[in-house]
């Protein structure tokens, strides 16, 4: 077995490249359930996308490596769309169109076997300690009133999670995928862009709504909900923006 190379790190798991595979190693035995659920979710998405132009790394095994629960899948070589955007800003419009086409293709898949995005958001909002019970009630009431769909939602769709190489287009990091409303997933992507690449956020939302025929106001109705769901991560640098979005529920 060759030496492993760190690719990414988080509070919950680290991702390594080893022997041509990407290995996600969870940091504590308490994450056994997260590991198994992420593997099941990935496998279901992998099966669903088999006839799509979107490719997904093949999952090979779930195991315990050095006492850590791990998921092993193909390591995909290539550049992320984020890298391509950074290196070729003159082609930003082309990449943004491609980005939206990929997301639209994801939303075209129906996933009745995945857990529901609404259920996940409900749990996240109920567990928040940073907002009062009245605000929670307003958010949960809004969430309950939103149309219920069973479309495939990535949950963390961003340019860094798309890899492009000579074989095609790969989308990675499916652990947060759920069945739900596509506009909730779009609102989530818009939020991620506002936090990490704000100059791209508005062009993305405008172009997505134009290409898909979706009302911008309909996507924006999800913003307080996705902001509340993000708040549970407890990132201090995000709190001001998220609380501002959550407060919109009072008068929207």
How would you label these PLM feature ranges?
Residues 6-41:
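ATP-binding glycine-rich loop module of kinase domains
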Residues 66-80:
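Conserved short submotifs of the Hanks-type protein kinase catalytic core
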Residues 170-173:
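Pre-DFG segment of protein kinase catalytic domains
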Residues 188-252:
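Helix-rich C-terminal or lid/interface subdomains of diverse kinases
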Residues 81-90:
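AlphaC helix of the protein kinase catalytic domain
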Residues 90-118:
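Internal "kinase-insert"/substrate-recognition segments embedded within catalytic cores
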Residues 108-155, 159, 165, 244:
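An alpha-helical support segment within catalytic cores of ATP-dependent transferases
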Residues 50-61:
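Conserved HxN/HPN-centered segment at the entrance to the catalytic loop
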């Amino acid at each position: 077995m060759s030496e492993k190379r760190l690719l990414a790190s988080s509070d919950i798991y680290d991702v390594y490249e080893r022997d041509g595979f990407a290995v996600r190693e969870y940091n504590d035995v308490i994450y056994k359930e997260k590991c198994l659920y992420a593997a099941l979710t990935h496998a279901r998405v992998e099966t669903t996308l088999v006839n799509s132009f979107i490719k997904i790394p093949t999952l090979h095994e779930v195991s315990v490596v050095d006492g850590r629960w791990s998921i092993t899948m193909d390591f995909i070589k290539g550049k992320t769309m984020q890298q391509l955007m950074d290196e070729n800003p003159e082609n930003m419009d082309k990449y943004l169109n491609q980005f939206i086409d990929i997301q639209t293709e994801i939303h075209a898949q129906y996933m009745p076997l995945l857990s529901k995005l609404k259920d996940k958001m409900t749990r996240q909002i109920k567990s928040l300690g940073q907002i009062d019970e009245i605000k929670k009630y307003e958010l949960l009431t809004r969430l309950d009133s939103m149309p219920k769909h069973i479309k495939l939602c990535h949950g963390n769709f961003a340019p860094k999670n798309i890899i492009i190489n000579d074989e095609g287009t790969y989308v990675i990091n499916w652990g947060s995928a759920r069945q739900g409303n596509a506009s909730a997933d779009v609102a989530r992507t818009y939020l991620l862009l506002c936090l990490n690449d704000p100059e791209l956020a508005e062009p993305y939302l405008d172009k997505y709504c134009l290409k898909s025929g979706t009302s911008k106001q309909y996507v924006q109705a999800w913003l307080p909900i996705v902001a509340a769901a993000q708040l549970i991560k407890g990132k201090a640098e995000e709190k001001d923006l998220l609380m501002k979005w959550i407060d919109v529920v009072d008068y929207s």
